[in-house]
Design a protein with these regions (language model features):
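Cytochrome P450
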Residues: 1-402
Length: 402
């Protein structure tokens, strides 16, 4: 989920009504993971209220479909948790969404050879990827693919990305409406992803489809209409990645993600589930952040004409504008952890074994850390001062690409 908030000017009547509605709710009823809050814009007021009144907030089972969890909404608390993997473990968890059930696991991964006990064990382990591992496994998995987005490799890719961006922009229609997200944001991102995975360019939109399905719940109007369609797509991605990795092991090493996983000295010990998990992280991370940042930059510059004029007058602000866009729209709303012991944070004790959501999107609006945090200002003194890429050992691997 991503979030777009209005400029921090006087509130409209509709915004005032929405804010009053959120502030009238019992504090315990607030559930930042409620997807309905995001398209409506209500999430702005949910986080504003939580930062002010209950920055370490507990959502009970009766108020969420995801099961009970804690929310950290202030910058300092998020940073404290994100940099303390001893107390806040990433093992087997990425978001506050309920783990996949054994039935859902079987629908995707069981080729007829898995026993019921193996399916149960896989479901109990939860997610296995470089995002959902603690040391030492985390370092091993991150090291296997990090070279693909190293500064040196990205420098080699830069001319190609620039050439493609120019060609896409030159092909846009003049004097008529068009879908910027589809024709520019998705297209350039899909082309780049296909290069990073060494996947056929003519099939690049398949990568976009898989990413969309992997990051959304099934339902009418969603990337997958139902659970069966979602399971089929995830199974298709799993099979494709497995076949690509096995094929690359017999080929000369290259710098794409799949080849790096195939030839890493550590990857011979990776399970198929771990290769799939790492591939999912790389696919979704490379798709969401880049695509949404391209789209958000156009949206924000259009809605903030004074910032647009500032950028036109001084193109040297482009790097700062990109960082501010990433902060303001926060492509990844949150990451989750599980406490390994009772942990006191900001005066509250979170019991051992509880799930904790670090809401980056709220921390990026924390007025105690960022002046005029709800405004879009492309020439901030420290534009990279944001939470969008996380902190600590799990800081976004592809932040330089974004």
């Amino acid at each position: 989920m991503t979030i777009a908030l209005s400029r921090d000017t006087e509130l409209t009547a509709e915004q005032t009504e929405a804010r009053d509605r959120i502030y009238a709710l019992p504090l315990a009823a607030l559930n930042p993971a409620n997807p309905a809050h995001y398209p409506s814009g209500d999430i702005r007021w949910v986080f504003e209220r939580l930062r002010a009144e209950d920055p370490v907030h507990f959502t009970s089972d009766e108020n969420t479909e995801h099961g009970p969890y804690w929310s950290l909404t202030r910058w300092a608390d998020i940073q404290a948790a994100d940099t303390n993997h001893d107390a806040f473990s990433a093992e087997g968890i990425i978001t506050v969404a309920r783990p996949r059930t054994p039935e859902q696991i079987a629908a995707v991964f069981n080729d007829g050879t898995m026993t019921p006990e193996e399916i149960e064990a896989r479901a109990a382990r939860g997610s296995r990827s470089l995002l959902s591992m603690d040391p030492p496994d985390h370092e091993i998995h991150r090291g296997a693919v990090s070279e693909g987005v190293s500064p040196a490799n990205l420098a080699m890719l830069e001319p190609l990305i620039r050439e493609r961006a120019g060609a896409i922009l030159d092909s846009l229609p003049i004097g008529e409406e068009f879908d910027w997200v589809d024709k520019v944001s998705i297209e350039l991102t899909a082309m780049t992803l296909a290069t990073l995975f060494d996947y056929p360019q003519e099939k690049r939109r398949q990568l976009t489809r898989w990413s969309n399905i992997l990051t959304s719940l099934p339902g009418p109007g969603m990337a997958a209409e139902n659970e069966e369609e979602r399971a089929a797509a995830v199974r298709e991605f799993f099979t494709t990645i497995s076949e690509m990795v096995n094929r690359r092991r017999d080929e000369e090493p290259r710098m794409d993600f799949v080849s790096l996983m195939a030839h890493s000295p550590h990857s011979k010990d990776f399970t198929e589930a771990e290769i799939f998990g790492d591939s999912t992280v790389l696919l979704v991370g490379g798709n969401d952040t880049t695509r949404n940042t391209i789209s958000a930059s156009v949206y924000l510059l259009h809605n903030n004409p004074e910032q647009n004029e500032k950028l036109r007058a001084n193109p040297a602000l482009i790097p700062s504008m990109v960082s501010e866009t990433i902060r303001w729209q926060t492509p990844l709303t949150h990451m989750a952890r599980r406490t390994t012991r009772d942990v006191e944070i900001n005066g509250k004790v979170i019991p051992k074994g509880d799930r904790v959501a670090m809401w980056y999107v709220s921390g990026n609006r924390d007025e105690t850390k960022i002046e005029n945090a709800t405004e879009y200002i492309i020439d901030r003194k420290n534009p990279r001062h944001h939470l969008s890429f996380g902190f600590g050992i799990h800081r976004c691997l592809g932040n330089k690409l974004a």
